[in-house]
Every structure is written in C-alpha cells, then in structure tokens.
Swiss-Prot record:
Its cofactor is NAD(+). Substrate binds at residues 61, 136, 196, 226, 230. PANTHER family: ADENOSYLHOMOCYSTEINASE. This is Adenosylhomocysteinase.
Length: 474
C-alpha cells in the first residue's frame, strides 16, 4: 500500500480521490441508520458535545463515517484511526478526510503503521490534547495507560511477549524519546472513554479491578441494543459474507466449527446453519453449551473437532482457542477464521514458521511440512471486516446511537463537575436502551402496543418504561 499523507492536511489515507465514492455510500448508509440520524437531529441545535475533543479508535468504515459526522454535528472535534489493520474501507476514510476530519487509516496497515496512527489521534494540531476517547477493543485506552507507566518505569516495555507488543513497545519508546510526558499529559486530560466491544470491555474491567483505570468508562457493548443486535444479528449477516468473498466455498454440507456460543457465536452458528452447514460448537460455559445443544448443535471439544471440521470460526475473545496442534490435525484446505477481536484467538504465531502463500489479499495458504495446506483468512484478524465490509448499516445504527449517547453522557456530566461518574466502568441506563430501540423500530414500520393505566399498575412499571428490571436477561 502506497498510502499518501498530504503535508498541507492533517490526514493519512490510501487515496483521497476515493472521497466522492465514499460520500455516495455514506449518503446511502444514512438512510439505513435511523437511530443514529434521529439522535443527530435531536441534539444538533443544543450542541451537547461542544468542547469535546474525541480521539476515536474504531473500524474506519462507511458506517463509522456516519458516526463521526454525527459527533461533529453535535459539536465535537474529532481525530480518528482504525482499530484493526485490515478493517478500513479506503473510500470511507477518504470521504472523512476530505470533509476536514483528521483520519489516519488504510486497509492493510503494518503493525508499525497501526501504532503510529493510534498515536496520531492524540496529537492535536494546536498542540493540545483530546479530552475524550471513543474506543473499540481498548487499544487507545491501553496506549495511554501503558505509556504513562513507561514514563515512570521503562521495564514495563522492555520484554515484548508477542509481535504486537514488539511494535507497541517500540512505538512508545520512540514517542518517549521525543516527549517524556506525552502519555501522562494526555491521560490527565481525558474525561472518559466509551468502549464498543467485548474485548475492550474485558480490558476495562480488569484495569478497574487492579486499580489502574484513570478515568470513567461507559461499557457500550453491554447495552442490550448493542450486544443483542450488533453482536448477534450483525455477525449473522457479515460472517458468511466474509467467508464467501474470501473463498467462494460451498457451505452446505460442510462441518462448521464455531468456537464460543455467546452472542457472536450464536449469530455465527445461525448463519452457517441457514446455509445448511453441519454446525458444531465448542464451549467452556455449561450454560452456553446447554443453549447450543438445545438449539440442535453438536457440542464438542476443539481437540475432537480439529480433524473433522471444514470451516473453523473463533468467537470467544479468548487466547489460543485454536492452537498449533489443532491446525496440524486439520484437513487439507480447512478454512480457519476469527470473528472475535484480536488475532491471538488463533495461534497464528505458531504457524509463521511455515511457508505462507498469498492467494489474494487477506487470504493465505499455510503450507505444513507434510504438504498439507490450510486457508487462513485475514491473518487471524476479523474476517467480516478483513474479507468483507463488516456489519450492515442498520444494525450499526443501534451500536453507534449508544456510542453517541454515552459520549454525551460522560462529557456533559464532566462539564457540570458532576460526581455521577467517578473512576469505574458503567453501563447506560435502561431507558436509554429502550430509546435506541424505539428509534430503530420506526424504520421497520413496527407498531408498539401501549399499556393501559391498569396494565402498567398491574405489572408495576411506568407506561413510558423502562419495562424490564436491570437484571432481566433478554
């Protein structure tokens, strides 16, 4: 990729000439994002994000472009990078850059470029800092916290444990050599972070438990209108899109092994079964395993499934779910992919010792010593964004409506000097979840039943909602 940065402008994209194409697709996406556009219309006049300087680290797609322009319409100043080296849609990045928003992203970044670009979202053109983070996977949040630690103790970045850490640690060392207080200065300015995905939320809770988190965080992922829609229905459509575009494989009749049966796994399993695959599920959690079994899926271990499966999909958010030994046992031409966040769900590092043969971008043969080949998609990173274009606009409207509301909530409370959000991890209240659902329903011409006064009194809720207790499981 010969991406070009224009020194007269504050951006780095693959080709700024793609902006017109991107703008046309953004216009179409807006018609499919009713919740997000309704929030833009509702708050545009009051400018609740005025003064917010948002460092955004989230897949730079057409749908994200609509999110960025919503944040700006509500008064925010924004800088953006993608949270994945393969997920950028170059025409989307070009359209946003052409509109005047600093964006640093192109499809097929190196790890060095990735961490350079993540730094760029904290480097405001006026020499100032951001005061909010919008994160997906937690890398932007991690960068500031780890960098601030390294300012005090360089040993924390002395021994990388992975290829990813090698480039991350090198980037931090390079920045500290130029600016010894860069991370702590940025960290002190941040009023809060809103986190998009399961993996990033896990990181936030771990940091909070260790007493390391330095600012309040809203867990957007666990809003019902995010996790039960984006994670399930989004993956149900985008997983197979990625596999099909990458391989043109016939899915009917194949044994498809889905590792993990949370919301992402449920959507993935449904998609594969809808195309008549024989779906097997691996799980550690007996409740999720029982759900899978009751849906008619065969529940097995990966040790057993490895030599039988034709297609493997990891959906766990965990580490080394598919190991070298598993891949060594797989059939010739088995397809291996991931729809969790990071590439370490599959132990990609363990097969880098073998010959790799690129079939096309993000589709590789890994050739084992005995001549067997397996197909790895997107080098173990997100298959739906690496090999396709991610979730459809409609379902991303729910997720990004939650992101926007969460940014407004944290920023406005910080501006008031409120003590509502001390350092910790929070979720949005139920009435806001229901608001997002109401906004989305209009697009589908759905008609909600209205409780009578007697019905509301009988079940002990307000006629206007919320209709469920916080402990209710949808």
């Amino acid at each position: 990729m010969n991406a070009v940065t224009d020194l007269k402008h504050d951006y780095l994209v693959a080709d700024i000439k793609l902006a017109d194409w991107g703008r046309k697709e953004i216009a179409i996406a807006e018609t499919e994002m009713p919740g997000l556009m309704a929030i833009r219309d509702e708050f545009a006049a009051s400018q609740p994000l005025k003064g917010a300087r948002i460092a955004g680290s989230l897949h730079m797609t057409i749908q994200t472009a609509v999110l960025i322009e919503t944040l700006k319409a509500l008064g925010a100043d924004v800088r953006w990078a993608s949270c994945n080296i393969f997920s950028t849609q170059d025409h989307a990045a070009a359209a946003i850059a052409a509109s005047g928003t600093p964006v640093f992203a192109f499809k097929g970044e190196s790890l060095k470029e990735y961490w350079d670009f993540t730094h760029r979202i904290f480097e405001w053109a006026d020499g100032g800092t951001p005061n909010m983070i919008l994160d997906d996977g937690g890398d932007a949040t991690l960068l500031l916290h780890l960098g601030a630690k390294a300012e005090q103790d360089a040993s924390v970045i002395a021994k990388p444990g992975s290829e990813e850490e090698t480039f991350l640690f090198a980037a931090i060392k390079e920045k500290l050599a130029k600016d010894a207080t860069f991370y702590s200065r940025n960290l002190d300015a941040i009023k809060g972070v809103t986190e998009e995905t399961t993996t990033g939320v896990h990181r936030l809770y771990q940091m909070a438990q260790r007493g390391e988190l330095r600012f309040p965080a809203i867990n957007v992922n666990d809003s019902v209108t995010k996790s039960k829609f984006d994670n399930l229905y989004g993956c149900r459509e985008s997983l197979v899109d990625g596999i099909k575009r990458a391989t043109d494989v016939m899915i009917a009749g194949k044994v498809a092994v889905v590792a993990g049966y949370g919301d992402v796994g449920k959507g993935s399993a449904q998609a594969l079964r809808a195309l008549s695959a024989q779906v097997w599920v691996t799980e550690i959690d007996p409740i999720c395993a029982l759900q899978a079994a009751m849906e008619g899926y065969r529940v097995v271990t990966m040790d057993y499934a490895a030599e039988h499966g034709d297609i493997f999909v990891t959906c766990t958010g965990n580490y080394h779910v598919i190991t070298h030994d598993h891949m060594a046992k797989m059939k010739d031409q088995a397809i291996v992919c991931n729809i969790g966040h990071f590439d370490n769900e599959i132990d990609i590092a363990s097969v880098e010792q073998y010959q790799w043969e690129e079939i096309k971008p993000q589709v590789d043969h890994v050739i084992f010593p005995d001549g067997k080949k397996i197909i790895i998609l997107a080098k173990g990173r997100l298959v739906n964004l690496g090999c396709a274009t991610g979730h459809p606009s409609y379902v991303m409207s729910s997720s990004f409506a939650n992101q926007t509301i969460a940014q407004i909530e944290l920023w406005t409370e910080a501006q008031k000097g409120s003590s509502k959000y001390p350092v910790g991890v929070y979720t949005l209240p139920k009435h806001l979840d229901e608001k997002v659902a109401r906004l989305q329903l209009k697009k589908l011409n759905a008609q909600l039943t209205v409780l009578t006064d007697k019905q509301a009194a009988y079940i002990g809720v307000s006629k206007e909602g919320p209709y469920k207790a916080d402990h209710y499981r949808y």
